[in-house]
């Protein structure tokens, strides 16, 4: 096979990863493609230069297939001809899918620790590169849930710790509980969902990677229609001969060197297009037009 494309990199903890990651969720939940197409999609992302893949044990459809997405990713990496050691796989625990279409939480430390060890087995690794507490559990004190990550770090089960779906106060609390070892925050962020801007800014101040999930607006049509809903991205895309999705991702990358979007994909062509955003060089005027259209004031 030919060598993978090399993309610009950004940093999570002490690891350099591609500026655009791959979100694995769409390949394992409602509307998921078959196994062959999923493997081909992951291979396409790797060949396009993506070296950061995000998954979770809760990315599955039926109650008896916990870790479906982790298993897919492990299989794809094992059958890929490139350097698997160059790829950082991030997973999560603390979310559950009972199998009836709902999502629930289990933030108990004992669950998080057991789930992480099970994830490591499914991924076929001695230590998980990045493990994230998936979502706060209202029935468990946040510090107790994050405390499980401390134990996992100290035991060598995970190499780095992150959190997801967190508020600014929870970010600060996690950083304190982890003794400064928090490396990433993964929150929803896109042109249509910008309520995580305080978290994005706080991560910049703290030197923590910010990982936007659903950076194009989600798999329910938001990603596909982003150029229709936000015409400036389509206009700039036409001017540059690229998709509006690439413009959105390039704009998000411009918000800070700590921002690493993780668009999901069900098809190879989707992630191939998204990966190109890492090299898309928009002018200062074009970036300002994007921000102005969303009512965001940029600092000079």
Regions of interest found by a model, annotated:
Residues 13-30, 90-103, 127, 132:
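N-terminal small/glycine-rich loop or linker at the start of catalytic domains
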Residues 33-46, 107-123, 169-172:
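Short, acidic/polar
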Residues 15-20, 49-51, 82-87, 125-129, ...:
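Short, well-ordered coil/turn segments that N-cap beta-strands
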Residues 1-87:
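N-terminal binding-site loop/beta-alpha segment at the start of enzyme catalytic domains
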Residues 47, 111-132, 152-155, 177:
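CE4/NodB-like, metal-dependent polysaccharide N-deacetylase domain
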Residues 4, 136-300:
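Beta/alpha (TIM)-barrel catalytic core signal, keyed to glycine-rich beta->alpha loops juxtaposed to Asp/Glu
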Residues 59, 80-107:
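Structural motif corresponding to the early beta-alpha repeats
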Residues 29, 59-63, 96-102, 218-222, ...:
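A short acidic, helix-capping loop that chelates divalent metal ions and anchors anionic groups
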């Amino acid at each position: 096979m030919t060598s993978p494309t090399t993309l610009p990199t950004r940093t999570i903890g002490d690891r350099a990863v591609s500026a655009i990651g791959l979100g694995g969720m769409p390949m394992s939940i409602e509307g998921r493609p078959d196994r062959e197409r999923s493997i081909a999609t992951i291979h396409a992302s790797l060949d396009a230069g993506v070296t950061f893949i995000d998954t979770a044990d809760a990315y599955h459809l039926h109650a008896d297939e916990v870790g479906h997405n982790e298993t897919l990713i492990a299989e794809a990496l094992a059958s890929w001809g490139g350097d698997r050691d160059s790829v950082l796989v991030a997973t999560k625990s603390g979310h559950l899918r009972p199998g009836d279409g709902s999502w629930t939480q289990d933030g108990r430390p004992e669950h998080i620790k057991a789930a992480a060890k099970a994830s490591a087995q499914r991924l076929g690794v001695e230590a998980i590169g990045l493990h994230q507490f998936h979502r706060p559990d209202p029935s468990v004190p946040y510090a107790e849930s994050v405390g499980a990550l401390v134990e996992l770090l100290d035991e060598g089960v995970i190499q780095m710790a992150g959190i997801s779906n967190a508020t600014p106060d929870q970010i600060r609390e996690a950083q304190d509980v982890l003794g400064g070892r928090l490396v990433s925050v993964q929150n929803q962020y896109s042109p249509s969902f910008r309520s995580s801007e305080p978290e994005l800014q706080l991560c910049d101040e703290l030197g923590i990677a910010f990982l936007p999930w659903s950076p194009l607006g989600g798999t329910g049509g938001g990603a596909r229609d982003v150029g229709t809903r936000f015409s400036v991205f389509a206009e700039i895309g036409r001017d540059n001969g690229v998709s509006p999705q690439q413009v959105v991702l390039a704009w998000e990358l411009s918000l800070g060197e700590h921002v690493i979007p993780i668009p999901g994909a069900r098809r190879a062509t989707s992630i191939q297009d998204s990966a190109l955003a890492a090299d898309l060089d928009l002018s200062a005027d074009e970036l300002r037009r994007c921000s102005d259209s969303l009512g965001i004031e940029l600092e000079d």
